[in-house]
């Protein structure tokens, strides 16, 4: 069993989740993910790693409460335990001196892109971080990014903080301050990663996205997380989760995600979250 050190809602519907897992914290790297279960009957949920403390033996993730199993996670308190905390899984993000790197995070991806930005800065890169949200009340960890970035940009749809607009305005925004990235890394919801990949492709900006499909075992056996990259079948859990965003068949990926909607809804119906229906 794995002890919960902290579980708190940091912005509406997003929770910071800190678990005592010494073996995982000892070997985890930026870009890795873990799989958890809230109880013996719960689904296996893949969560990107947002931070870790090797001395304390803890691992931090940011998760969104969207279904029955994440609702169970959201009810956990410090001192509670969970039966499953598997990791680190997946390939770590490539870290080296690329030159100028743009790190874009939205929603739960703000958390998962943080250790990537930190490691890239430590590798000698110029790191420019962009945090994107619908409104200022959905932003978090901005102070952490200032410590690991040469500059932090904020974009909100309603203009309550930073630049008013959306990710489609990023190229113009960077052009105005003379920034041309050698590498762009995007962590967030599927639409954000897809849209940013579409924006950067004609510009020739190499773009790496952190894919988050449904998974079961996390070791490539179930095949649920497969996707087409460069015309070849890949498994997000073992070949990724990082992939070249310009090579992903986004239309196929979105269709596969939709096919699991009934199975995702059913656990929520059977949970105690009847208020959703």
Located regions from the model:
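A generic structural signal for residues embedded in beta-strands
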Residues: 36, 84-85, 227
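Ferredoxin-reductase
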Residues: 1-80
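Glycine-rich beta-alpha junction loops
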Residues: 23, 40, 134-135, 213-215, ...
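FNR/FR-type flavoprotein reductase catalytic core
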Residues: 68-216
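Short, Lys/Arg- and Gly-enriched loop/turn segments at beta-strand edges
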Residues: 42-51, 89-99, 237
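Short Fe-S-cluster ligation motifs
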Residues: 235-239, 243-277
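Local cysteine-cluster metal-coordination motifs and their immediate loop/turn environment
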Residues: 112, 212-242, 271-277
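Short, surface-exposed secondary-structure boundary micro-motifs
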Residues: 39, 87-88, 230
